[in-house]
Amino acid sequence: MLLAVMVCLTCAARLVGQPFHAGETAQLRAFLRQNAADEGRKNFQQLGIADTNAIDWATVTGLTWGPGGRLTAIIWNDKYLAGDLDLSGFDSLRVLRCQVNNLTSLLLTRDSALVHVDCYDNLLTRMDITTNVNLQHFCCRYNRIATLDVTHNPRLTFLCLSGNPFTRFDLSNNPLLTEFYAAKCSLEEIDFSRNPLLKLVSVRSNKLKRLDVSNLANLQQLFCYDNQLTELNVKGCKSLLRLAAYDNRLTRLDLSDCRALQNLPLYNNAIAELDVTACPYIDFISTMNNGMQTLKLPLLPLKALEIMCESNRFTFSALPKPMYLRSYTPQARRTITAPADRVDLSSEYTVQSATSVYTWRDGTTEVTPTQSHEGRFSFPAALSGRTLTCEVTNAAYPKLTLTYDVTLTAPTANVLLVANDARPTVHSERGLLIVTSERPLTARVYTLTGVQVGTLRVQRGEASLALPPGLYIVSLSDGTARKVVVE
């Protein structure tokens, strides 16, 4: 214990007694005499220095000195400092943290020992780090720098440029890069083909139209949302855990190599079909506002999987199981055209063991089909050319009502649905509509506008109904229908 105390005292004595590098202290003193960001104050006052003519450099906050009286570290972040900081020629300086100040220039020329620089949140308009060949960490986010050359910094592993007006950036000589941030720039293109060790990429809020991160086998997180992407290549990204690509213009996305994928926010694109069957660990998918109508899930999805898929084109039959849905309503109104005697919505009839309910309207008037069988419908020929509205509900998805606008065309045959044999028969005589059947049968009679005007129940034999002259549709309980003229 005594030996340790003696060593510490000896080191302290050497630090106090050592001469500090005259060139470095002169450059620091010049900076300290400049105006600070706080009005009416100088930089030296922000650091608690009383007199720049009598500075005890060993006690100045944030400075670390090494052998020969050379600076090895400067930690001056968030001090309300301002002006021009010239550190050129500080060839022992390894760490510089001067972020969150109001610096207007920063010179690091010939500082070849630098490995770590944080100068973000300042007012810098240019930076030259071409002589900082050992630099590993550099962050200059939220300044005003339009160009930066990092081709002379092959040891960079961390690079953050966010919030600067870059349009292009050359990463061709940064093979060790593992984290790259360039959010809220003006990037129009970026090439990652020579950065095989990347684990995290953030290029959100730029002007990118294409992005290729294929074969980045170590990539775990990709943030590329809020761009103009029409193409995104993630082939070979076998370690990708999170892909945030929402607010783009994507029409397709191949995730077949992304087996590790867990988190996938993709809303506000134009992806009609999405296949995540190759992603067994996916636990969050957000696809709102894509016009999506198909979502293919893994064979055995995680029980914790949550899906947000409202404002798309899903039908009941295409929606994922309710247990996975955090939100799913509304879905887009659908438009179809069909012959009046063959409207087929049977795909939505039985979903998750629940039977759907169909409600038909012509404007605000409810319409009863002349025939209805498990989601297949027939309507009077007189409705040809009209557009009916069908609302479909299903108890399996209680928050959703599907709406179809169905334009009816001419029937495919004069007889809506022809029976397989001559029985039962429907005909008219002297103002009577007559139904004949050898077995119990119910006949509902409609006008051509779909208004029901009567019901006949036939036990065996014949039943009749007096009607005004006209053309009628008779819907029989055996699933067939007839047209008949009453005179």
What are these regions (language model features)?
Residues 306, 385-389, 469-473:
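Short, conserved beta-strand segments of beta-strand-rich sandwich/propeller modules, principally
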